[in-house]
Amino acid sequence: MAIAVSHRFSPSGDLPVEAGRYRLVASGACPWCRRVLIARRLLGLTEAIPVSWSYGKGADGYWELTGPDGEPGVDPALGARSLAEVYEKTPGYTPPPTVPALVDTTTGQVVSDDSGDLLFDLSTAWWDLHREGAPDLYPLNRRNSTDAWDEWIGSQINVGHAVATHSKDPEKAAAAANGVLVGFDVIDTLLARATRMEASREDGLTMLDGPALSAIVAIGQYLCGDKPTGSDIRLFTTVQSYEYGGRQHYPGGEAPSISFWPALARWFRALEGRSGWVGPEERSALGCCRP
């Protein structure tokens, strides 16, 4: 994280829930941002938390903001051209600035840059502002399972993919890439078993490869039963990045398409086709072909 303290909306946190007070700086190309963007849409918080879009790095090498015309320029709400300018107002900031970044417009400071915290807090602390019929992304009766999935997906898949595609150390990149592919084997096997498909990637896997038992026993059509949860969001955005360009940068050449894992592919395509899971900004950034 780029800030020393990432504040929380939880009961033990210090941020008040207030529509219109915060602004999310995000990029559709970033899987960490897409976590928050998906939750924001699914929960009906698009008006309560407006977005300032970044489409890439500027002359300073950091995320640049956009003007009213959608071109690089001064963001009218934040009064800055570069995200670095916003972070520089924030106590405890250490470069480089990162996205997503939640800005408190009353102070102009970044109050959270942790996508996992934002996903969880929007799901559990912003209840009063959720749309009618919004999904419960972190149901209490599944919390042990979502916690277990979040921990395993975070290290095995999310961080693994980032290291595989960005590390300058060939050995670290190769080890991380192998971990992601084994992780896909595990998830494909568990989804196949739960949905009565043939577990085509089961050979060679051990219990040590998978998540905790509290995650395994919950799996159904989705990771924690018959409805998507925050854990599905965490996995989905990395699978997106993998499928739409990331796999081409894996060590040793292009890694297999997600279709190599039939049950995982079915899970992914089902979510990709659901309303709210892919917004126009993400679709443009990823080059997705599905409407």
What are these regions (language model features)?
Residues 1-291:
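C-terminal alpha-helical interaction module
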